[in-house]
């Protein structure tokens, strides 16, 4: 496991490492704390501890900075963010007791939230909530408040809400040391069983699940200076306000306060679980400085290898990835599919657009046979689709692909980058809908890319020439006609373009060869043309040495 930086720092050496290492941290949050919260009638064998009671004052000298008990409304976090941004950035220092600050991986795993102490347990509500302890990678103090009837009540830390196993040698502190994050549970998969639905933990990272999913890719509140040579900046959600859900609602609302050296922000997450869990995000940014390298609606994922290119990977599994492609619906009505890659060198691609209709990192391959992993079950990882609300104007969908040799590293980042910088001192509002699940995108396409593979073109001997095979699937009956295939490249020579029916896939197979010549990087584009109008995905690809 890699070392994880604190992720609110922005040292030159930290930019990529922090982004990569968070996948290991989130793997921890999903495996070390993956108990099921049982329904009320299943009485636990351990003594029942009453759910945490929010208190007006912390239990120790630590100051409650943001989640003070008092009146709360929809503008409360916006006002806090505006006030925070009007002052210079302050590094908050909330040191943990030495024993907690230096916890090992196994020790931190041994501190678990006691499910019988879940917020709203035994109240018959559709949601429950559990908090994460501070320690190990998660050093920052995160404040949490519960909101009910327009009143926010600070949720103080108490050690009795956690259980410590035999690995922990010291007692948990009695002081209000805060939390490192929280997770929301819901009867997502089975009536009467509260499964994990969503997690907020680490910088501005969060994750969610659709029905039947296992945790995979992550989202962030904001991306700043991603892949910048001077280092990436990682904003942090410093405080959360969670609204008590109603009995008959399938909605839970979370408010969050974001902070970093460059910007403060207010976020509102409206979460609706389902086959594809929907999260409506409303955000207002208050930049302290001009934001010229900003990413809105960022997603972070992992791609190690697939049939698309294994390099020298020595792995019994055919494919290993949380996502296998970037899907984009642009403002011109095109639907674009860009397979992901694990390049030998850092690659950044920008897809210019005006008023994007949607984009997201998609896990399209859903067959177990493609992964053969009995533990990871990559076929269950959710896709994440982003739908902008309103006109986002000019900018680009940016895709960053980072070399990695291990699946514990997140090495894929995507986001929307506005064309114009966001001025210092301004208020920048944007909104979007997130859909997490197996099929979060409506099947509006009649022809979609189902598989991309590449390999050497010359069977007799190795040559630089590459063979590409792109399979298309039809949603509906296959027409009698064969489409025309158009393949373009930014360099090299395209040869031997062939299009054929693929009955096994209810679609077509496009094959062609690329002679790179002296190029080290070539952009490829393939389109299928039908005589009758059809919505057909355009295939994009970046070939590199």
From Swiss-Prot:
Disulfide feature: none
Annotated family: Belongs to the OpgD/OpgG family.
Protein's pathway: Glycan metabolism; osmoregulated periplasmic glucan (OPG) biosynthesis
Highest taxon listed in the record's lineage: Bacteria
Organism: Shewanella sp. (strain MR-4)
Main location: periplasm
Assigned keywords, A-Z: Periplasm, Signal
Record's function text: Involved in the biosynthesis of osmoregulated periplasmic glucans (OPGs).
Signal peptide region: 1-34
GO BP terms, alphabetized: beta-glucan biosynthetic process
Name assigned to this protein: Glucans biosynthesis protein G
Coiled coil: none
Localization of this protein: Periplasm
Region: Disordered, residue numbers: 38-60
Gene Ontology cellular-component terms listed: outer membrane-bounded periplasmic space
Gene3D superfamilies: 2.70.98.10, Immunoglobulins
InterPro entries assigned: Gal_mutarotase_sf_dom, GH-type_carb-bd, Glucan_biosyn_MdoG/MdoD, Glucan_biosyn_MdoG_C, Ig-like_fold, Ig_E-set, MdoG_OpgG
């Amino acid at each position: 496991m890699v070392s994880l930086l604190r992720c609110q720092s922005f040292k030159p050496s930290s930019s990529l490492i922090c982004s990569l290492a968070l996948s290991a941290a989130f793997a921890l949050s999903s495996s070390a704390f993956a108990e099921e919260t049982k329904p009320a009638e299943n009485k636990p064998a351990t003594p029942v501890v009453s759910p945490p009671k929010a208190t007006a004052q912390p239990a120790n000298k630590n100051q409650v900075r943001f989640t003070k008990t008092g009146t709360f409304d929809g503008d409360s976090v916006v006002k806090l963010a505006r006030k925070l941004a009007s002052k210079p950035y302050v590094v908050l220092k909330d040191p943990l007791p030495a024993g907690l600050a230096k916890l090992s991986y196994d020790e931190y795993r041994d501190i678990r939230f006691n499910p019988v102490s879940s917020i709203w347990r035994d109240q018959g509500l559709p949601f429950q909530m559990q908090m994460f302890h501070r320690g190990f990678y998660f050093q920052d103090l995160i404040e949490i408040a519960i909101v009910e009837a327009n009143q926010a009540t600070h949720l103080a830390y108490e050690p009795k809400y956690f259980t410590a196993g035999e690995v922990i040698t010291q007692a948990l502190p009695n002081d209000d040391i805060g939390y490192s994050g929280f997770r929301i549970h819901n009867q997502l998969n089975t009536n009467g069983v509260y499964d994990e639905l969503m997690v907020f933990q680490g910088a501005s990272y969060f994750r969610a699940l659709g029905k039947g999913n296992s945790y995979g890719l992550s989202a962030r509140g904001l991306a700043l200076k991603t892949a910048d040579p001077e280092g990436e900046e990682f904003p942090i959600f410093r405080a959360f306000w969670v609204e008590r859900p109603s009995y008959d609602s399938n909605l839970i609302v979370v408010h969050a306060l974001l902070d970093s050296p460059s910007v403060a922000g207010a976020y509102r997450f409206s979460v609706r679980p389902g086959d594809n869990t929907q999260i409506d995000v409303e955000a207002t940014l208050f930049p302290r400085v001009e934001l010229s390298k900003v990413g809105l609606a960022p997603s972070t994922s992992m791609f190690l290898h697939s049939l698309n290119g294994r390099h020298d990977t020595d792995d019994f599994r055919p494919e290993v990835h949380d996502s296998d492609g970037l899907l984009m619906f642009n403002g011109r009505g095109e639907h674009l599919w860009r397979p992901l890659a694990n390049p030998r060198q850092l690659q950044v691609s920008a897809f210019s657009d005006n008023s994007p209709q949607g984009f997201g990192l998609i896990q399209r391959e859903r067959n177990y046979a493609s992964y053969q992993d009995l533990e990871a079950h990559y076929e269950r990882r959710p896709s994440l689709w982003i739908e902008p609300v309103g006109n986002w104007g000019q900018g680009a969908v940016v895709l960053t692909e980072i070399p990695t040799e291990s699946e514990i590293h997140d090495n894929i980042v995507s986001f929307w980058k506005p064309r114009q910088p966001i001025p210092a001192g301004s208020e920048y509002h944007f909104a979007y809908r997130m859909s997490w699940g197996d099929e979060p995108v409506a099947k509006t396409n009649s022809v979609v890319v189902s598989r991309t593979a590449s390999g050497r073109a010359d069977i007799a001997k190795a040559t630089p020439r590459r063979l590409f095979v792109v399979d298309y699937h039809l949603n509906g009956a296959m027409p009698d006609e064969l489409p025309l295939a158009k393949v373009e490249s930014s360099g090299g020579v395209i040869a031997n373009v062939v299009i054929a029916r693929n009955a096994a896939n209810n679609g077509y197979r496009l094959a062609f060869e690329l002679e790179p010549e002296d190029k080290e990087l070539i952009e490829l584009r393939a389109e299928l043309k039908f005589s009758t109008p059809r919505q057909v995905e355009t295939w994009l690809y970046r070939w590199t040495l």
